[in-house]
Amino acid sequence: MAEKRNIFLVGPMGAGKSTIGRHIADQLHLEFVDSDQEIERRTGADIAWVFDLEGEEGFRLREESVIGDLTEMQGIVLATGGGSVMSKEVRNKLSARGIVVYLETPIEKQVARTQRDKRRPLLQTEEAPRDVLERLAEEREPLYKEVADFVVRTDEQSAKVVANQIIEKLDF
């Protein structure tokens, strides 16, 4: 029996990784997993609380461990946290264990999609959300592109249409 393939979605917060990932999983009859939700399940606390208690460094260590475990599964669609690509270990595991899709999204769309979401610790600062998102994009975009097998823009169509575009590009 052939091994089931994995699809890993990377990109900034507000790119639609979870929404698009669910559509892909439904259509391909795969399991959908969100790495942030898995961290919350394992810790029994929300991401903001983990950030408050352990800082970003502690959170990233948990994220690295969780993504390491999840990428060992077969037949999943995984929505990763926006900063997960900062870890070389995570990038290596994503590349080695599945097809990586970078969901590229302009800053304006990210701001619009995240402005009322209080569950994003990196945006809960004195710094303007747009400035935070621009800084994060500068740091992370080269890493998203490095790890991606292909790039899909998410700003001009519905999540369902984007999911279909991704499925068309997959060699399943």
Swiss-Prot record:
GO BP annotations, alphabetical order: amino acid biosynthetic process; aromatic amino acid family biosynthetic process; chorismate biosynthetic process
Residue sites binding ATP per the record: 14-19, 120, 157
CC cofactor: Mg(2+)
Domain of life (superkingdom): Bacteria
PROSITE patterns: SHIKIMATE_KINASE (PS01128)
GO molecular function: ATP binding; magnesium ion binding; shikimate kinase activity
Principal place of residence: cytoplasm
Cysteines engaged in disulfide bonds, as pairs: none
Cofactor binding remark: Binds 1 Mg(2+) ion per subunit.
Annotated residues for binding of substrate: 36, 60, 82, 140
GO cellular component: cytosol
SUPFAM superfamilies per UniProt: P-loop containing nucleoside triphosphate hydrolases
Keywords assigned by UniProt, alphabetized: Amino-acid biosynthesis, Aromatic amino acid biosynthesis, ATP-binding, Cytoplasm, Kinase, Magnesium, Metal-binding, Nucleotide-binding, Transferase
Catalytic reaction(s) noted: shikimate + ATP = 3-phosphoshikimate + ADP + H(+)
Pathway: Metabolic intermediate biosynthesis; chorismate biosynthesis; chorismate from D-erythrose 4-phosphate and phosphoenolpyruvate: step 5/7
E.C. number(s) listed in UniProt: 2.7.1.71
Quaternary structure and interacting proteins, as annotated: Monomer.
Alphabetical list of NCBIfam families matching this protein: PRK05057.1
Main function: Catalyzes the specific phosphorylation of the 3-hydroxyl group of shikimic acid using ATP as a cosubstrate.
Membership in a protein family: Belongs to the shikimate kinase family.
Protein name according to UniProt: Shikimate kinase
Organism, scientific name: Pseudoalteromonas translucida (strain TAC 125)
